[in-house]
């Protein structure tokens, strides 16, 4: 997947202020994983890249409060137009982020997480 910031930075804005540009084909990084990095939770969501901008595809799911991974998996499986390869790639990256947060992330600053996962869009307070 292309870095989230790179995808959004490449978007062109037309005279009406609307993002325009290339919409990736299947398996070309059509999605951005968004992470809300908090001291006691991490939340995951997925946006779809459309016309050079992004549009929310899923809700935010929290870990460990809920089983964020399982809920994300279920929601992605309900979208039949998402390829198996895309779904696996998204869920694998979600697993990496959750594992990092559980093992080290609670003690790491948001900026360190951004450096570890440059292809993911982060926000938060931790």
Curated annotation (Swiss-Prot):
It holds the Pfam family PSRP-3_Ycf65. Part of the 30S ribosomal subunit. InterPro entries: PSRP-3/Ycf65_sf, Ribosomal_PSRP3/Ycf65. Probably a ribosomal protein or a ribosome-associated protein. This is Probable small ribosomal subunit protein cS23. GO terms for cellular component: ribonucleoprotein complex; ribosome. One of its GO terms (molecular function) is structural constituent of ribosome. GO terms for biological process: translation. The keyword Cell membrane does not apply. The lineage of its organism: Bacteria, Bacillati, Cyanobacteriota, Cyanophyceae, Synechococcales. Belongs to the chloroplast-specific ribosomal protein cS23 family. Gene3D superfamilies: 3.30.390.140. Keywords: Ribonucleoprotein, Ribosomal protein.
């Amino acid at each position: 997947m292309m870095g989230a910031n790179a995808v959004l930075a490449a978007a062109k804005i037309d005279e009406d202020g609307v993002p325009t540009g290339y919409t990736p084909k299947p398996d070309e990084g059509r999605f951005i994983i968004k992470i809300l990095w908090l001291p006691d939770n991490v939340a995951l969501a997925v946006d779809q890249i459309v016309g050079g901008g992004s549009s929310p595809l899923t809700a935010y799911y929290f870990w460990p409060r809920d089983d964020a991974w399982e809920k994300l998996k279920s929601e992605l499986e309900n979208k039949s137009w998402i390829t198996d390869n895309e779904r696996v790639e998204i869920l694998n990256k979600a697993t990496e982020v959750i594992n990092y947060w559980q093992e080290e992330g609670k003690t790491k600053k948001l900026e360190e997480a951004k450096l570890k996962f440059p292809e993911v869009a982060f926000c938060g307070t931790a």
